[in-house]
Amino acid sequence: MFNEKKAKELVLTSLVTDSYCLGTHWVYDETQLKNAPVDFNTLNEPMAMWHKNKSAGDFTHYGDQTLWLYEYITENEKFDAKDFLDFWALKIQSYYGYVDGACRNTLENIKNEVTPSGSSSTDLSIIGRIAPLLLVSQNEQEFIKNVEDFVCLTHNSQLAKNASKFFAKVIIDRFKGLSVIDALEKNKETSDSQIQGFVNQGIESKGKVTFDVIRDFGPACDISGGFAGLVHLLAKYDNLKDMLIENAKAGGDSSARAMIASIIFMIDKPISQIPNSWLNIKAKIG
């Protein structure tokens, strides 16, 4: 169902997006953001201490873990949740980047033989890592199942499951030819009231300034703030570069918002929408 070339382009898009966001990722202070020593037209080294070992072209821990999933899938030509969890656990235990609460709690559960081992995290970022699953999903039902199985490995909360299923279905409908707004509206109708509220807030905010909107919704990691923020990005912009620049200027968990938004946005767009200099990431997809 999913064109392999386009699926790989979406993996690349999500990684480029994460690397681009690295510069202001997890910067929350408004004064710092408005005076950020970064060039928003290119990739930048990180401002935040959490990424102190990183440089321009590197990824946040979101991009690194997306790359792990891509590596696993290209090596195995399938997604097996239990097998991937073992693969992921080996990777994360020797990882030099930031290890967030969801990962730490999941590792602790694995160590203590707690099943299911996924944390109760409601962080948005896990959803932005799902693009590689398109490569091994033969139909929409398998994609939805693969997404849920993947998300639950580290983010086993009902909100994370609900939000990831919503965006998986939006991706499917975008592949079927629906516009961004039509796909969001269609899947809103079959979602719970919380997700309906997030979608409505995001779409209704499209005429407002992105910096202000994201600060108002909440720029941090949780789905409760980031969901509406990424819908705002999708509703407001018809150009990938503009969308990612304005999102990065708002700081906070910029990568979590943008990775999902860029995947959905680029399904019917040429890869040429990504500026050439942004492709200088430290990974090869192909």
Q: Which residue stretches match the model-derived regions?
A:
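Structured, active/binding-site neighborhoods that engage oxygen-rich ligands
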Residues: 1-286
